[in-house]
Amino acid sequence: MSLETALARVTTLQTWLQPQPVQQALPATATQFSAALQGASAPMGLAPTAGATATSGTPAGQAILNAIRPEVGQAEQPPGSNDSPRIAQYRQATAGSGVGPWCAYFVSWAARQAGVPIGDTGQGFGRVDDVFAWAQKAGKALPAGSTPSPGDLIVWDEHIGVVERVDPDGTIHTIEGNSSDRVSQRTYGSDGGGAVGYVRLG
């Protein structure tokens, strides 16, 4: 659809909605029109324009990403131990968890840092299954096949991470704890590498 056609349709709709004469300046360029249209559609939850990379999600999701981006590269000491002084801090965000696989500790820590703690009492979880079961009960789970937003948790069978961004072609970029014994950035196809679902915390 051309810019002129789109503007004509917008003008017609405005006339129907507001029968009194209204003087409005139309955007001078296609870029201004696109920005105005995006701004108007954002509150309705409409998807970004085609070709756009989803780089920001909810405020809670953005806060989670702000917490975890500096953690990329944090590694187990020694490798294969599921532990380090920093991983011990992630573990403290869960109730009574011991040394063990720590991807769920990491997302529990990140959510707590972002002010949206996981669990009915904010206790966090040491097991992926517990995170997803809580999210389903709390109405925060999204099914496999959904399009995630940055900051959403991405859940697999026995592993969990955080969506960093989603490319226009559906490619999903993540940050994950306990991935190759460290906090790592990974990339998956639009199916999230077989993700079983997502969790949107805010």
What is each residue range found by the language model?
Residues 116-181:
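...with weaker cross-activation on analogous glycine-rich loops/strands in unrelated enzymes
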Residues 10, 71-72, 112-115, 165, ...:
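Generic helix-packing signal
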